[in-house]
Amino acid sequence: MGLAWGLGVLLLLHACGSNRIPESGGDNSVFDIFELTGAARKRSGRRLVKGPDPSSPAFRIEDANLIPPVPDKKFQDLVDAVRAEKGFLLLASLRQMKKTRGTLLAVERKDHSGQVFSVISNGKAGTLDLSLTVQGKQHVVSVEEALLATGQWKSITLFVQEDRAQLYIDCEKMENAELDVPIQSIFTRDLASIARLRIAKGGVNDNFQGVLQNVRFVFGTTPEDILRNKGCSSSTSVFVTLDNNVVNGSSPAIRTDYIGHKTKDLQAICGISCDELSSMVLELRGLRTIVTTLQDSIRKVTEENKELANELRRPPLCYHNGVQYRTGDEWTVDSCTECRCQNSVTICKKVSCPIMPCSNATVPDGECCPRCWPSDSADDGWSPWSEWTSCSVTCGNGIQQRGRSCDSLNNRCEGSSVQTRTCHIQECDKRFKQDGGWSHWSPWSSCSVTCGDGVITRIRLCNSPSPQMNGKPCEGKARETKACQKDSCPINGGWGPWSPWDICSVTCGGGVQKRSRLCNNPKPQFGGKDCVGDVTENQICNKQDCPIDGCLSNPCFAGVQCTSYPDGSWKCGACPPGYSGDGVECKDVDECKEVPDACFNHNGEHRCENTDPGYNCLPCPPRFTGSQPFGRGVEHATANKQVCKPRNPCTDGTHDCNKNAKCNYLGHYSDPMYRCECKPGYAGNGIICGEDTDLDGWPNEDLLCVANATYHCRKDNCPNLPNSGQEDYDKDGIGDACDDDDDNDKIPDDRDNCPFHYNPAQYDYDRDDVGDRCDNCPYNHNPDQADTDNNGEGDACAADIDGDSILNERDNCQYVYNVDQKDTDMDGVGDQCDNCPLEHNPDQLDSDSDRIGDTCDNNQDIDEDGHQNNLDNCPYVPNANQADHDKDGKGDACDHDDDNDGIPDDRDNCRLVPNPDQKDSDGDGRGDACKDDFDQDKVPDIDDICPENVDISETDFRRFQMIPLDPKGTSQNDPNWVVRHQGKELVQTVNCDPGLAVGYDEFNAVDFSGTFFINTERDDDYAGFVFGYQSSSRFYVVMWKQVTQSYWDTNPTRAQGYSGLSVKVVNSTTGPGEHLRNALWHTGNTSGQVRTLWHDPRHIGWKDFTAYRWHLSHRPKTGFIRVVMYEGKKIMADSGPIYDKTYAGGRLGLFVFSQEMVFFSDLKYECRDS
């Protein structure tokens, strides 16, 4: 039995030893990360705690930044092991805080530029993420349903072999994951020199939160052995090979050469050869000797254990100062220390003494505590007297007492222990409660005056009886008063004020003047005395001698005041207004010259006429309104300057627009000066407006407009579906947009391969769903029907796509007309279509869709107008439209002479058209050279949407750039845009990923309007438009959601879209992709992606089959933004003024996100730079 037991123990030890994971030591098969980073260090960012494995330390991560990295030499060994076995096994036990995201291991660059490789437990998404940096770009591979952040202990086994990864959580096998590159290409030979291995440390918010134990890299074993050692059953740990073969003789981290049982090969069934069996017999003979020796050793240990047990059975003893005591014995060491034996332990303690009540206590010899002794004094033994008690009564006579105590054991204590004395605090009050009562009234007093009106008074007292002991006071008045009257008092008279002196009787030589007064202040009454003194008073006046009058000869200028003096001299006053001089002689003042802006200056002419005297202004020029001042003198001319303002019929009420139309002022140089435009919900020519249900600019019924003015007065051929182009191929009065069979070939449009060509046979040779009758390449598959040169021959079959007479195979710009074939940078792409014409870039890559190739795109744009500094014709002045009418390389925004005719812009009457003679035949301030067409683009100003930009004259989205905002997404298609109405109407037909259709016209200040219509009941997502577009990462967007909804994919961020209209500014650090996609869906701010400027607080979503009309105003110079959305005739939503200066202008376009059948109709944009 003993032999069998010993052999079993040895075999068990042998088996466990062969399967045990070796500790890190001299070999490189196991790398314990905590051991390598110095687990025993203090203040190392971790704290030792208990884990599920009692034989290994576990650490709570407190500050991962303080945990040192793995030493470079050990990290190099680890890298060499990974490269040798083309993979690794990573083991770890962890207890991660709930719903947190934390990094288990990370290989970070020493220059802090980022991570090369990391293993992250993403508790928010329930995944284990492997992050790899490949060619400077981060790739993330996730193992789904890896629920590790639960607050419970979890054990993971991660096996990575080349480009495959397999995860086990506890004993449960997760799904395989595939890496973008083999792991050995990440763990390069020089990795340890440029990077370091960190535990628990990730990005800014990705440090691990929780407890870690046994974090190890293991090599030279298999996942089966690892799982078996963990106690996992074979059924749960069956390993499926990852289809990796041994390369160049290296062994993989997990052996993949397992072969299943065979039933006919005996040796294969046994698994051991005969030679191996012979070897095992020899080993077992040697083991027999070892087992015998082991039996002897165990027998000896058993005997020693018995002797030790006998010793333990003896009763316990105590030893103190060499003396032996049994349990329970007590003894005294000295007079103050007592000891006792208790379970082999000696316990000693000091004797505690009581407090003595006497003052003469002493300690007798041989004792530890003091004692009191008898005394001969009678007072000895008494304590001091206590304080007297309170008096026994509060009034009258009472008593007080005090006491003392006696130590009768040690003293005689003669005398009393209590003393008593009398006390008297105050006399007791013998009164009783009594209410007060009035006495009788006193007689009335005599009158207070001897004459006139006075008063008499009487009084009474509250003393019959007086109130006491809180009795009630008397009620009523203690004093009464009433009037008394005597004879009236006499009033003495008083003088009133003197009157003014009257006129002197003569003007010179001495005369008399007098004044008077009345006795009425007051008049004497009731026997009063009259006033004392005279009623009148006289005095002498004008005593001076009479002079000689020098002004009698009229020496001054007509109208000038003359002043004479007694000596016969005289003096003239100032000249009249409009004259200058000394008063004797006065000359006319030229007010037009003295005040050069007294009248309106027009075309360099001061419209002022001088008269004698005075001046007058000429009437305001044609198309101006204002006053016509006239008068005399410089002061009058300065204070009353003529102001002539351009006439505006829209504000002065002289227009003839319909009451349901808006008057748009075009400027006083235009003829006419205004244009009438029907308001949303109405259509017509502006003079006459009728109802327009679908808001496409065409009335529901025919309107009786003036002769030859039928534009937008004709009845809408699809009154309930926007179709601003009114296309009607078969001329049946039903527009193509709502006609089920446009070509009347009895084939419905949704199944007709030529909906606008009669072809009942539906022949389609090239199977591109475009019938041969309408296919511009009937023998070449081209469903897009692209035709760059518009010659009727599709690009797919054209030998010269762009029509420049150069065959495609020799054309360096196949889609752009360029006869010269100039190619400055010799990259095979002609300058006309090269997005970096001066730098070699044959791939033409443009990651941010700003039409500048990545090779030359530096994104440095100091004025934020969408044009980088080295390509901006005004790098320091925002001018998104880059207008340069004289083509001198300097944009109009920073050019003081836009037409280069030598006349500065501020004085040029044709700023954009050269006219050095400045001829202006009608004198209206607009030169003849640009009369009625300011930019000379052959479009009259009244019809020109941008009269000051020769490059833009009408709204046109026929050419647009399609921008995918989630180019890697495969859950939906890219948008499909259908162009109608010469680019003024676009329809997006499919449920798609987020995308834009951006026109090529660029704008500074702009107004943008259009009709929005969803022609389906399917889906409820986003549609809208963009403005200020500069790249796929930088633009403004107005987007509208029908219902509140969370985006289905919560990676990389959770996105909640609320119903209602939103205005957002996109400034993405990542550009198109899943980050921007989720940020656009989310109603709110997403750091580094999107900021919401405004969201409709009423959360009104769009309705199916309902027409809406939007109007956008954007003024980049001030940052002003306003969006108004109409439903029919009424405003449904209004953002009000929003101010944001992120972008100084850009391009316009349309936006969709997961919404099909979106109609954008009757699109209009207008420049607002003036």
UniProtKB/Swiss-Prot annotation:
One of its GO terms (biological process) is cell adhesion. Residues 65-270 form the Laminin G-like domain. Pfam families: TSP_1, TSP_3, TSP_C, VWC. Its main location: secreted. It is found in: Secreted; Cell surface; Secreted, Extracellular space, Extracellular matrix; Endoplasmic reticulum. Residues 47-95 are annotated as: Heparin-binding. This is Thrombospondin-1. It comes from Bos taurus. The gene is THBS1.
